[in-house]
Amino acid sequence: MSASHEKPRSVEVSSTLSSLESSDLSEDRSDQGRHLTVGGKVVRIVIAFAMMFACALAPPLLKQVPVIQSFALAHENPIGLVESFAVGSCVLLIYGVAVVLALILCYVLGRTLDRGRHVSVGLRTDRRALLWLAGMILAALVVDLVVAGMLHVFGIAGGGQPLPQSPAWLMIVESFSIAFLLQGIPEEIIWRGWLYSSLGETRFAAVSSVLGFTALHILSQGGQQNLLEHLTYLAPPCGFAVTALIVRTISGSTWAAIGVHGGFHVANDLLSDRLHLPVGSITWVLQGLIWAAVGLLILVFHRRQRRLATSSSSE
């Protein structure tokens, strides 16, 4: 299964990055990327890897603090509005540490490694950025619905997995915290925010942003049983990383990429059991291919709109 889809996915990634280079990445800012030495580029990629590990480990380490452990044990089954609010706030604060750490590290890098360079993490919040964020979350829900529909047509949908029995509000808080505070926001700040900008928003920056992020998931544990599944498990992060890069470039906002990344995890968490998505290579490859296709469609539409705008202004 993996071999039959590996080539199309690599072709899609290559063509996407090529299109981006020829249109959206050929701005003046790319000059600072070309002025970087090979060593400077390698250092930045290594730092991105280290930052991602640091942000991922921060919440689990915080949970080991005795006070927090005691609070969690004493409020395993919260009763009443006040206790529920306290538990929900604690969950948000624990996972929010990853976001705070990512922002602090990017600030320090801006004051040291990138001092004097035009590097931006792209977190300016305005109406357009929020629309991109919401739109990509909605796209993530649609992607899972399409994957589920295809699997049902193929007759290979999963069985009826038992749904979580936690209170609905706690499921929503935990899903949001893990999808956005632990993964979507800090990881996109690092890969599509800081690293992409620090490398000059060039083709090399785009490739590094996508492939570096994808490669890290070889260490993830998501139900893989063998080598083939460890490889096909890379399809979703590769696919949505391509789309995250495209929308980051088109919108100029990392919030769009955060919508892709966080939306992917929210959709998986809330819909996988309800849509009977099987855990395995077929689901992962379909998700990766459809996400890459979404990114390519957005890119094609964007380029078409630019051509129409250019032709109308020249008349």
Which functions belong to the PLM regions below?
Residues S251-H265:
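Juxtamembrane non-transmembrane "cap" segments at the membrane-aqueous interface
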Residues I185-S208, T249-S253:
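Membrane-interface helix/loop boundary segments of multi-pass membrane proteins
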Residues F53-P59, L141-V146, V210-S220, G262-S272:
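Aromatic-anchored segments of alpha-helical transmembrane domains
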Residues L62-S89, R115-P186, E201, G223, ...:
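Juxtamembrane helix-loop-helix connectors linking adjacent transmembrane helices
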Residues V46, A50, L130-A134, V173, ...:
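Hydrophobic alpha-helical transmembrane segments
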Residues P186-W191, S220, T243, F264:
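Short active-site segment of divalent metal-dependent hydrolases/proteases
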Residues M1-T125, A148, V242, T249, ...:
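N-terminal, membrane-interfacial amphipathic/helix-forming hydrophobic leader that caps
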